[in-house]
């Protein structure tokens, strides 16, 4: 799974064709059977409106939806090891959490190992059981999550953990409200036909309430 799914997916082919190609190449199954398996994969990664999304192109999907497709491609042939290279960096914070939960759930469900590459210690702490710390391309510490965060041995690891703790505790949340948003909606029209009539909407944001305090 790559950092930027938009550049990893082919904009000239539908999601169905791209996942089917992997299944047919490696499993030697028919196109109809591949499509059936593709639908199952997309359900497993939490993509909604499968019959519609499977016929979509990558540019018609949101960042989170594209990353779900990439995860579906990653698990398509039942790997023992899934490599995820900064898979949430290009996503907003809310979608990041959803994708992380999805990856963790799939790891347990499919009983596979995950090599998760990240520079974000918060993400690593949420996901990993065992951690390798690298500096200048060399592994300087290899230990359990508990030891890395609560008993680091290498000086570089200590600096990373201390910096993370300072950043987390650097500012106290204030009581002053600096932004409030109520029932925010961002809908994109779906146009079809020669006259490009609006036949529906993609609800990117639907009735979101947000309050932001000083230092938050």
Model-derived regions, located:
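Conserved ABC ATPase "signature" region
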Residues: 33-52
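Conserved ABC ATPase signature
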Residues: 56-61, 65
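A short, proline-enriched helix->beta-strand linker immediately N-terminal to the Walker B motif
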Residues: 76-80
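Helical segment within the ABC ATPase nucleotide-binding domain
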Residues: 97-110, 122
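A short, surface-exposed alpha-helical micro-motif characterized by mixed small hydrophobic
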Residues: 124-126
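Short, glycine/charged-rich "phosphate-handling" switch motifs in NTP-dependent
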Residues: 130, 142
């Amino acid at each position: 799974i790559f950092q930027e799914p938009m550049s990893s997916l082919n904009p000239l082919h539908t999601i169905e064709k791209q996942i089917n190609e992997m299944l047919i190449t490696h499993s030697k199954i028919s196109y109809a059977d591949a499509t059936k398996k593709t639908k199952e994969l997309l359900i497993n990664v939490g993509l909604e409106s499968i019959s519609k999304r499977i016929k979509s192109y990558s540019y018609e999907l949101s960042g989170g939806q594209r990353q779900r497709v990439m995860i579906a491609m990653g698990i398509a042939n039942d790997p023992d090891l899934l490599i995820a290279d900064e898979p949430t960096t290009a996503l907003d914070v809310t979608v990041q959490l959803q994708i992380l939960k999805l990856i963790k759930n799939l790891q347990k469900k499919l009983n596979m190992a995950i090599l998760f590459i990240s520079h974000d210690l918060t993400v690593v702490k949420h996901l990993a059981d065992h951690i390798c710390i690298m500096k200048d391309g060399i592994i300087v510490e290899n230990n359990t999550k508990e030891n890395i965060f609560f008993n680091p041995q290498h000086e570089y690891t200590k600096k990373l953990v201390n910096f993370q703790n300072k950043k987390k505790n650097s500012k106290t949340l204030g009581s002053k409200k600096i932004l409030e948003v109520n029932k925010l909606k961002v809908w994109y029209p779906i146009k079809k036909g020669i006259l490009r009539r609006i036949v529906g909407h993609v609800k990117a944001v639907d009735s979101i309430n947000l309050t932001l305090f000083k230092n938050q």
